[in-house]
Amino acid sequence: AEDCVGRKACTREWYPVCGSDGVTYSNPCNFSAQQEQCDPNITIAHMGEC
């Protein structure tokens, strides 16, 4: 869903990854939370900001 926000215990470390959904995630943990809980079809497009 558009308004879904995946949450799990992630550090605040800034190690950005760019998702295939065009969103910059602050680190791989936050990306995986979104993927697991909201959109299993997203992938990491590349490391770094989108």
Swiss-Prot record:
Query: What are the residue boundaries of the Kazal-like domain, all occurrences included?
Result: 2-50
Q: What are the cysteine partners in each disulfide bond?
A: C10-C29, C18-C50
Q: Does the keyword Disulfide bond apply?
A: yes
Which protein is depicted? Protease inhibitor 2
Pfam families per UniProt: Kazal_1
PROSITE patterns in the record: KAZAL_2
Q: Which residues are glycosylated?
A: N30, N41
- What function does this protein fulfil? Serine protease inhibitor. Strongly inhibits human neutrophil elastase and trypsin, also inhibits porcine pancreatic elastase and subtilisin A. Does not inhibit chymotrypsin, plasma kallikrein, pancreatic kallikrein, thrombin or papain.
Site residues (Reactive bond), renumbered to this chain: T11, R12
Key word Isomerase present in the record? Answer: no
Q: Which organism is it from?
A: Cenchritis muricatus
Q: Which GO terms describe its molecular function?
A: serine-type endopeptidase inhibitor activity
Keywords in alphabetical order, please. Disulfide bond, Glycoprotein, Protease inhibitor, Serine protease inhibitor
